[in-house]
């Protein structure tokens, strides 16, 4: 037996007007609002205005911390207000949303999400990333998918542009990773549906990405910003839920194995998830020998200011052996779809992508 649920979503600058009706669907009269400090500052005015005059009580507004660690998850789990609430409203980027989603597993709570940045698809997914206190990857948790997503393009447009930029970088991975992971065929219905939807993920990025980033840099809520936000949150999020089930995993592949391995490499600088994943996409195409897409995606990375070389994410070719070693611990490597990964091909792909990137920048 398989049951598939997808998040409802409301998009628009007036999206919070739908919040009371969405809560009423679940008989919810008590909520706790959890998120990052900046995210709460952006989202709370609209949420509070929407709830004014209703029978919904906000039990707590809580800053979750700065990363989706076990310690921050425990703070949500141990909050009396979160324990009492009917619905947890999670506001912020992926780490804030993943913290609340993971806490909700133990609390057995419904989660609504408000992505105040669109740096990844966490607002829609039934998967969450958990980090160790030192920032390295602990692994994944598997919560229920959020019940309802509220996407406000104005809030996203007025957030720091680097998160929008990194979100495009992360979303670039969805279509090629799923296409590669499922390339042996023989998919059952749910996985096949996920693959079909994955085919819709890349083109909006190529079509609207450059304009959207320019608009976000001017704090301008535009059609391009909305289309990118929908692609990152909804398209890739729905794909994640369809390609990640108990009996199969096609949701990520070489690009995320690369990213997750980099989390264990000490280096100077701070690099956003999607920023590094976008370089991992080039590694994926080098790994599969897809020169046409390597060139296309690398050219887009360059146009967007996303990385095309190891040095742009604080690494060098001397780090390749360590990247291979750390990659062994990743879920992507362990799943090994469509066939087991090898150190030799992975190392050669990282080097080949890096060499091509340097040629592109020359």
Where are these regions (language model features)?
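A glycine/threonine-rich phosphate-anchoring loop and its flanking beta-alpha core
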Residues: 105-198
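A short, small-residue-rich loop immediately preceding and capping a beta-strand
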Residues: 80-103, 107-118
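Short glycine/serine/threonine-rich phosphate/pyrophosphate-binding segments
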Residues: 16, 40-44, 70, 95-102, ...
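Active-site segments that bind and position negatively charged phosphate/pyrophosphate groups
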Residues: 188-299
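ATP/NTP phosphate-donor binding region
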Residues: 1-84, 310
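C-terminal charged capping/lid subdomain of soluble metabolic enzymes
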Residues: 2, 18, 290-362
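Generic secondary-structure signature for well-ordered alpha-helical cores
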Residues: 24, 52-56, 135, 154-156, ...
């Amino acid at each position: 037996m398989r049951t598939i649920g997808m998040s409802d979503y409301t998009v628009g600058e007036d999206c919070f007007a739908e919040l009371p009706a969405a809560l009423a669907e679940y008989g919810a009269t008590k909520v706790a609002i959890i998120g990052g400090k900046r995210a709460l500052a952006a989202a709370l005015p609209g949420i509070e205005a929407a709830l004014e005059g209703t029978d919904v009580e906000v039990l707590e507004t809580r800053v979750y911390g700065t990363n989706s660690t076990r310690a921050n998850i425990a703070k949500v789990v141990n909050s009396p207000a979160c324990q009492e609430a009917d619905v947890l409203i999670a506001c912020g980027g992926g780490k804030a949303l993943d913290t609340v989603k993971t806490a909700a597993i133990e609390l057995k709570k419904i989660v609504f999400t408000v992505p105040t940045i669109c740096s990844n698809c966490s607002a829609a997914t039934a998967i969450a990333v958990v980090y160790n206190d030192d920032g390295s990857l602990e692994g994944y948790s598997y919560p229920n998918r959020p019940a309802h997503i509220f996407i406000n393009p104005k809030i996203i447009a007025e957030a720091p542009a680097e998160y929008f930029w990194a979100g495009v970088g992360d979303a670039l991975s969805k279509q090629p990773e799923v296409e590669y992971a499922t390339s042996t065929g023989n998919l059952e219905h749910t996985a096949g549906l996920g693959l079909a939807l994955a085919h819709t993920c890349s083109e909006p990025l190529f079509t609207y990405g450059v304009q959207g980033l320019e608009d976000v840099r001017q704090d301008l809520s535009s059609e391009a910003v909305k289309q990118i936000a929908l692609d990152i949150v909804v398209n890739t999020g729905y794909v994640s839920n369809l390609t990640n089930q108990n009996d199969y995993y096609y949701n990520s592949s070489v690009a995320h194995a690369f990213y997750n391995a980099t989390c264990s490499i000490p280096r100077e600088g701070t690099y956003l998830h999607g920023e590094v994943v976008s370089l991992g996409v080039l590694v994926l195409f080098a790994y599969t020998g897809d020169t046409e897409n390597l060139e296309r995606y690398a050219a887009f990375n360059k146009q967007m200011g996303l990385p095309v070389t190891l040095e742009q994410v604080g690494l060098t070719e001397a780090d390749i052996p360590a990247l291979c070693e750390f990659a062994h611990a990743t879920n992507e490597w362990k799943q090994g779809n469509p066939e087991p990964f090898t150190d030799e091909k992975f190392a050669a792909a990282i080097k080949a992508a890096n060499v091509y990137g340097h040629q592109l920048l020359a």
